[in-house]
Amino acid sequence: MNRLPPTNPARRHFMEIVAAGAGRLSTIAIASSLLAVSRTKDANALGIFPKDDPGTAPHCFGRGTLILTDRGEVPVEDLATGDLVVTANGALPVKWIGLQTMKRNASASWHPSVLPIRVSRFAIDDQTPQRDLYLSQEHCLLIDGVLIPVKYLVNGSSIAFDDDAKMSETIEYFSLELDSHEVVLAEGTAAETFRHWGGQIAWDNLGDYQDLYGSKQEVMSPFAPICRYTGGRAEVSGLLRLAASRFVDVRDPIQIAYDRIAARAVAIAA
């Protein structure tokens, strides 16, 4: 494993994020087990899945996103196979950079699911992101020890759909794949790398990828539990109240993150 200087401030903050989230994982596991005792259709309203299926939407970075490497920050589109990127597990080599380009007719509108989401500078905390971060809607951020799709954090202010992209004729997404599912620093923010889940990949350069690695890919285990709603938020709140304990905080981890980030946006705007 490649190691980086311990004095690197961005990496130090990265490790603080990972360490802070570790203590919350046991709470989430307990909450998940409490909810799992119910076998009704509502019992899975909040999915906390160590082996979650992310669906077929792209999980990617926008063009120009700066990724921390062993030689500093590099735009994601300029990374190449073999480059070392900073992860919680040290500096690991890039396996592939996938490109997905979507185009629209000038007279048509983008489908809402295609539009990127902008995470504004310092939307998460006092240090992250260091600059505006643009992600596909299903792309996960590491918050409180779990991976949360950024679409669940949209508040219309500090985290919002990219209005500029609505007028663009093309939208590009870049996938950063390593040999395993990891979390890297994108604009200083802990964000997931691409994870094979067994579904179909729609990269422009898929043919080149298959020439190197073949068409069959092993499903990757996620770096951390992936949280997503598979039912309504109201259903989740009711289930969590039923599982409430004086000793265990079983609140919805997505709602906790959303509320904290939204409150921060209001405070910054004041």
Identify the residue ranges that each predicted region occupies.
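N-terminal secretory signal peptides
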Residues: 1-13
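Short, positively charged, Ser/Thr-rich terminal linear motifs in low-complexity/disordered regions
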Residues: 3, 16-18, 26, 265, ...
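N-terminal export signals
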Residues: 13-37
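Generic anion/oxyanion-binding catalytic loop in active/binding sites
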Residues: 3, 34, 71
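Structural motif
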Residues: 77-83
